[in-house]
């Protein structure tokens, strides 16, 4: 079966959490940075070009959705016509763009987005490494600052919890949200 659309990547996840302050501190220690915070919503980003990686809404603790990037506006329009997806809406989050929201077979949110503007790439200080017989760093210690956190560059994968794994696999593959 030919997939309905072509998906390029994953973009962000949306979670619901009762305490945004605790979640913000956890994600900062995890290696993310605060983009925007209100009493009801928190947006966090990494060091890469995605405007945000995680959207947290205040409320009872639960998973809301994963967002996938359509290959084109035409693909976003196609997916918006699929049974479990809605009309295209303009995103009000950093980077703008458009979204069609739907639900998978287990009732979890699935967002398909297009047109989100990436940020300019930030340059990161790289520490040379020695590889095999190639010596790029001689007599120099490679030290990390005390308390330094990991660098999160991008939202690159997501997990799924399914009642019927094969049916969910087929559903996501039909939308080209997973590839084998």
Kindly give the residue locations of the regions a language model identified.
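A structural feature that tracks compact, well-ordered secondary-structure segments
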Residues: 15, 54-57, 67-69, 111-113, ...
């Amino acid at each position: 079966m030919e997939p309905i659309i072509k998906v390029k990547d994953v973009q962000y996840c949306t979670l619901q959490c009762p305490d945004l302050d605790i979640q913000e501190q956890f994600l900062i220690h995890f290696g993310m940075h605060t983009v925007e915070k209100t009493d009801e919503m928190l947006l966090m980003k990494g060091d890469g070009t995605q405007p945000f990686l995680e959207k947290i809404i205040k409320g009872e603790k639960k998973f809301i959705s994963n967002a996938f990037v359509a290959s084109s506006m035409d693909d976003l329009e196609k997916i918006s016509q699929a049974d479990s997806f809605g009309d295209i809406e303009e995103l009000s989050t950093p980077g703008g763009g458009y979204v069609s929201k739907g639900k998978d077979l287990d009732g979890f949110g699935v967002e398909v987005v297009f047109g989100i503007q990436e940020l300019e790439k930030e340059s990161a200080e790289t520490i040379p490494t020695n590889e095999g017989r190639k010596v790029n760093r001689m007599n120099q210690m490679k030290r990390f600052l005390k308390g330094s956190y990991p660098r999160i560059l991008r939202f690159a994968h997501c997990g799924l919890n399914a009642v019927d794994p094969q049916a969910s696999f087929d559903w996501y593959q039909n939308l080209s949200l997973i590839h084998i």
